[in-house]
């Protein structure tokens, strides 16, 4: 039985392509020494600063950082542990700063009797202060350091 030369060529080409695909699976990775899904130990979490001192802000409208640990705080649709101290009626009892008046405004600027739902989840903007080292060099400069001295006299 004779096989047509075209079929023989196609069969050989398919075998060669299959072998090439199998070899391509073992191609060197471009991501370095570790395989992409390898298990690597996570670095330790940075220590939370818990001195309860307010930290200065670097720019207007910067959300203040949280100067205490919030580990274990419940923050869900049903409960917000932050409001137990920072809500208007409780802040004086525990010497905690009251949440900003802007947290009582809706999108249109209308004042509400309680915290606006869009401001309810505190950790969307506020984070605990830690002693973590920056991952990149911080080149932020305050606006006052960028202004020429001649503008300050005006």
From Swiss-Prot:
GO terms for cellular component: periplasmic space
Principal subcellular localization: periplasm
Record GO biological process: anaerobic respiration
Any one GO molecular function term: metal ion binding
Cross-referenced PROSITE patterns: MULTIHEME_CYTC (PS51008)
Positions of post-translational Pyrrolidone carboxylic acid modification: 25
Binding site for heme c 1: 68, 82, 85-86
Induction line: Induced by nitrate. Not repressed by ammonium or oxygen.
Disruption phenotype: Deletion mutants show reduced nitrate reductase activity.
Pfam families tied to this protein: NapB (PF03892)
Lineage: superkingdom: Bacteria
Keywords: Electron transport, Heme, Iron, Metal-binding, Periplasm, Plasmid, Pyrrolidone carboxylic acid, Signal, Transport
Compartmental location: Periplasm
Signal peptide, first to last residue: 1-24
Binding site for heme c 2: 103, 122, 125-126
PTM text: Binds 2 heme C groups per subunit.
Entry-linked PANTHER family: PERIPLASMIC NITRATE REDUCTASE, ELECTRON TRANSFER SUBUNIT (PTHR38604:SF1)
Role summary: Electron transfer subunit of the periplasmic nitrate reductase complex NapAB. Receives electrons from the membrane-anchored tetraheme c-type NapC protein and transfers these to NapA subunit, thus allowing electron flow between membrane and periplasm. Essential for periplasmic nitrate reduction with nitrate as the terminal electron acceptor.
Subunit structure: Component of the periplasmic nitrate reductase NapAB complex composed of NapA and NapB.
Family: Belongs to the NapB family.
Record's protein name: Periplasmic nitrate reductase, electron transfer subunit
Native species: Cereibacter sphaeroides (strain ATCC 17023 / DSM 158 / JCM 6121 / CCUG 31486 / LMG 2827 / NBRC 12203 / NCIMB 8253 / ATH 2.4.1.) (Rhodobacter sphaeroides)
